[in-house]
Amino acid sequence: MRNDFFKCTALAATLGLLLFATFYSPIAAQDLPKGELEIFAWWSGDEGPALDALIKLFESRHPQVEVINATVTDGSGINAKTVLNTRMLGGNPPDSFQVHAGQELIGTWVRSERMEDLTALFQSQGWIEAFPSDLIQLIGTDDGIWSVPVNIHRSNLLWYVPANLKKWGVTPPTSWEAFFKIAPKLRAQGVKPLALATNWTASHLWESVALAVLGPDQWSALWKGNLDWTSEAMISVWQVFNGILEYTNDDAPSLSWQQAIDMVVNGQAAFNIMGDWAAAYMRTTLKLRPGRDFGWLASPGTGGQFMFLADSFGLPQGAPNRGAALAWLTVLGSREGSDTFNALNGSISARLDSDLSKYNAYSKTAARDFKRDRIVGSLAHGVVANEGFKNDFASVMAMFLKNRNPHKAAQAGETIAIKNGIIR
C-alpha cells in the first residue's frame, strides 16, 4: 500500500510541478511576498517562545511581510478550533492555521474541500524524502498532501520526580498491575498516586490505558472498524480506566494540565500522564533539569510503543495572502525552521535529518524511541479519528466520569463510532 501511495504521489507531484511554476512562484527569491500573513495557532504560554522563534526566523527571510499572530490560548486547541470553525465556515479563513495532522484535518476541512493540495510544494522542497513515509501517508490522501508537519509529540508518557519516589519508597510502574500495587502505599503516605486535570486530560489518560490493555494491533484495528467497541477487550479498557480513577484527585475538573504537573513537582502526587509538552513546561517555566529534577517513562503497559501526534499547518482555499502563506509553510518544513521550533518546544522534528545536538536530554530519547518503537496514532490529539468523533467522545467521557459504568461507556463508544463512519 505504501508503494502504491508513493507512485500516486510521484505522479501527482510531477504533474503538479507545472502548476507550481505558475501558482507557487511567491517562494522564489525574485518574487518575495509582501503585505501581511495571518497565522492561527493555539501555541501560547510555555510553547509561546518556540512559536515566537519561528516567526522571527520567517521575518528574517521575509522582512516585507507583517506577521499577524492570531493565537487563541488554551491547552489542546479546543477554543482555537471553535474560532477557526466560525471563520472557515464564514468564508473568512486565516492564511494558515495550526491543526493536528491526520484525521482532524482530513476528516474535516479536506473532506469539505476547503484546503489546497501541497503536493507540488513537498516535491519542490525535497520533503517527500525528508519526512518519514508513514507520516507522509498520514497527512495525505489519494488526492494530495494537505499540511506541513512541524513536530512530533509523544502522548503516552508517565512523569515523576525521582527524588520524591525515592523518599516514598516506590519505583515508576511499567504496567498498570504494578501501579495498582504501589498506589495504596502512596495513598497511605498522603500522596495522590496519579494527578489528573480537566476532562480532555481524562481522554488523554484513557488512550494510554486503552493502548496498554489492547496492544498496538487491536488499538489500530479499533480505528479501522475491525474491533467491536462492545467487545470484552473494550469493556476491560473501561474497567481498568475506572480502577485508575480511584487513585486520582477529586478536584481534577478544575485544574489545568500544568497544575496537574505542579502536583507532581510539589510532591502532592506521584505521577502524571501527559504528552511531552510537559517536558517543555518543566524545563522552561519551572526551570527543572530533564533526567535529574524530573523523569519519564512510557505510560504503564506501553513500553516499546510510541503514541504520537503531529502539529501541522495547511493552506486554506481562499487564503487572503496566499503567497505569504506558502512562504510560511516553506520555512516550517525546512530543517532550520524545524530545529528552531522543536529545540525550544520540547517536541522533536518530523524531519529525518534534524540536528539532535540542539535538543535536550528528553528530546534525544524521544528521537531515539521514535525511530525504534512501534508507532501508533493518538485519539485525543486528532490522529486516528475525525473531529466529529473526538467531540462525541468528549461527551462519552463526561458521562463516564459521572456514572462510572464501563458497559454503558462501551455501548456509547460503538454508537459514536457508527455515527462518525468508523464502523460502516
Which residues fall in each region the model found?
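Periplasmic solute-binding protein
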Residues: 106-111, 134-174, 198-222, 307-314, ...
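A structural signal for short loop-to-beta-strand junctions that line the ligand-binding cleft
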Residues: 87, 94-95, 125-163, 192-193, ...
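Extracytoplasmic/periplasmic substrate-recognition and gating elements
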Residues: 60-61, 66, 90, 168, ...
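Conserved N-terminal structural module of periplasmic/extracytoplasmic solute-binding proteins
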Residues: 26-111, 125, 172, 253, ...
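Glycine-centered hinge/linker elements that transmit conformational signals in sensory
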Residues: 183-186, 224-254
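C-terminal capping/gating helix-and-loop segments adjacent to ligand/active sites or protein-protein/ligand interfaces
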Residues: 223, 347-351, 365-422
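Hinge/lid segment of periplasmic solute-binding proteins
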Residues: 100-155, 180, 291, 361
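Extracytoplasmic/periplasmic substrate-binding proteins
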Residues: 42, 55, 108, 205, ...
